[in-house]
């Protein structure tokens, strides 16, 4: 085995959750408040950050929420949607093989660490991962520092021996 440290994203890599959760969450939140999402909603939200998207939905759909309460409700909606998410084919077998070969693995995700733990536990694969890093703020996945932190915490120092 060439790579000794493995850094996985959860959504879209290990779990089939991109469409169900991340594309479906705004629709589900709007329906919770009796609103009908417009057909162009996904395209409209695509280039917005979380805060800008929240402001847009509150304003355009007249939601009776503050930004703070919006994010609280959105966490609930996302948690409910994650209950339907399944593993992608072959994931369990691959993780077991990597573990048997002595690989150290972690999760680096934009999803809240607590939510990741819940999903990974429900799917029976949490035991494969040493830790979960929330890629937010300074440690965002668009910056290599988050991956260097993960590699270091996995006991690695050589990026060539680490798979992302």
Predicted regions located by residue number:
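Hydrophobic "anchor" residues on beta-strands that sit immediately upstream
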Residues: 5-7, 106, 163
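Substrate-recognition "cap/lid" segment bordering the active-site pocket of phosphatases
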Residues: 84, 112-163
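Metal-dependent phosphoesterase signature
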Residues: 37, 56-93
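Short helix-capping segments at alpha-helix termini
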Residues: 31-36, 61-65, 124-128, 155-156
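Helix-loop "lid/cap" segments that line or gate small-molecule binding pockets
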Residues: 26-30, 49-64, 119, 150-151
């Amino acid at each position: 085995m060439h790579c000794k440290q493995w850094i996985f994203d959860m959504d879209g890599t290990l779990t089939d959750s991109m469409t169900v959760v991340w594309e479906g969450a705004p629709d589900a939140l709007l329906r919770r408040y009796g609103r009908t999402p417009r057909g162009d909603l996904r395209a409209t939200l695509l280039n917005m950050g979380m805060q800008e998207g929240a402001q847009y939905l509150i304003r355009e759909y007249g939601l009776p929420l503050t930004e703070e309460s919006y994010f609280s409700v959105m966490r609930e909606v996302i948690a409910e949607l994650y209950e339907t998410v399944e593993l992608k084919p072959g994931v369990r077998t691959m993780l077991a093989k990597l573990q048997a070969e002595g690989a150290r693995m972690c999760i680096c995700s934009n999803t809240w660490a607590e939510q990741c733990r819940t999903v990974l536990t429900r799917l029976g694969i949490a035991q494969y991962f040493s830790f979960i890093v929330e890629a937010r703020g300074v440690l965002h996945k668009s910056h290599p520092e988050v991956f260097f932190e993960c590699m270091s915490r996995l006991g690695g120092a050589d990026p060539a021996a680490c798979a992302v």
